[in-house]
Amino acid sequence: MRPIRGVPLAAATLLAAALAWPAHASAAAAGGEHCARQDRVRVPGAALQLGACLPDLTTTGLAGTPYTDSADQAGLTAAGTRTPSGVPGLQIDGYFPDSSHFNTTHGWAHDAQFVIRLPDRWNGGLVVTGAPGTRKQYATDKAISDQVLAEGYAYAATDKGNSGADFYRDGTRPGDAIAEWNARTTQLTRAARRAVAQRYGHAPRRTYMTGISNGGYLTRWQLENHPELYDGGVDWEGALWTPDGPNLLTSLPTAVARTLGSARDEDMYAVGFARGSEFLWPYHEKAYWGVTQKIYRAEFDPGYDPDCPGASAGSTADRILAPCPADATYDYAARPAAVHRAVARVSLTGRIGRPLITLHGDLDALLPKAADSDVYARMVDASGRGPLHRYYTIQGGTHVDGLYDTYPDRLRPILPCYRSAFDSLVSWVEKGTRPPADHTVARPSGGDVVDSCALGDPGASSR
């Protein structure tokens, strides 16, 4: 959590400058504009940075190399998703000073890791994101990085300063780990903007914030708290934190109770889970509900059942995913004021200062939209920022697109709608073209739902 003390910045910078990744075996020799000014790029504040001049910065070109991690991307996209390739440029991996060690990528055992990708053919923009869930900096390479790089954007992603199921152990006070997510995202944005200027000769003309799930939360938080850094953002099913609820800790206990046989379907509907999403519940019982409730409850309310999860969420997959029985009766509203204050430290307000597009699937069975983005949209409206917000419900969308492969007759991937939303945001910001009004994007009865999505679908209905 805390920056490492006792390492002078000048020494850290010299160390960073002295290191470089070995060039990829198939990398073209640097020349002309390929990786120009590579030797001038320094990531401000980084304790370590390693640069590599690569023939392709997309997941197609990086597969099997140290420059991406396909395992950390698992489940986020549908199997048939088409991605662009052939984007040469410079990749910088590194980390900022930090005293926690959850992230073992590159064998560093050091948190606050980041990746910055600088394509040779730059369009003048920068896209920043934070990892979804408790994943790490390469998690959205296929979902986000590939497409924006192909469009000419520089790209930067952070591991948020902690990762993995034991992330809640980071810090000294309840809420510290998640508060660090926000600080690390701001830190990387500022540093990436300067790195971009060093590489291309001027600062980015546009900077966009975006992300999935916890990355969507970060997008909301950044546009509320640091609008000066960004020109807009796309929020893909961002997690909602509010001090008095709703939040994850007001809906997931009921899901845990149902898993353990002490809650009914009607109880699930009452806390926001959608009718029609029941076919997804058995999977979420095994993969999401128990672990998500216990680790986020441990982050904000460690005094409740301190032995579960305790010092670790578990050492095996079964132990990590298993629910804590006491979570079935967890009552966030009745918890001490200190718990609500811990959540308040990272809570959202709806007071966005830049244009924001939110997407949320109507069959999300982890963060049900009725207890999340529906509420956030009302918060934005109540704060007087409604003109800066668009909210699209994706019919047939769920929390991770990978489930489409199991239920292609019931679901649709959100990624193609996300790509359309990003294009709409850019047109909104740069051309003044307002996106369609809030509506539900209907699931088409045919066609290519894996790689196409029209936000202005004629089958849309008003929110």
Where are these regions (language model features)?
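Primarily recognizes the serine-hydrolase "nucleophile elbow" in alpha/beta-hydrolase
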Residues: 136, 206-255
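Short, solvent-exposed loop/turn and secondary-structure capping segments
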Residues: 138-144, 166-171, 175, 220-225, ...
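Secretory targeting and sorting signals
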Residues: 1-29
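Cap/lid segment of the alpha/beta-hydrolase catalytic domain
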Residues: 129-190, 198, 403-409
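Gly/Ser-rich "nucleophile elbow"/oxyanion-hole loop immediately N-terminal to the catalytic nucleophile
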Residues: 118-123, 174-183, 191-213
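C-terminal subdomain of alpha/beta-hydrolase-fold enzymes, centered on the catalytic histidine
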Residues: 304-462
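Proline/glycine-enriched tight loop/beta-turn segments at coil->beta junctions
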Residues: 108-113, 119-126, 204, 351-353
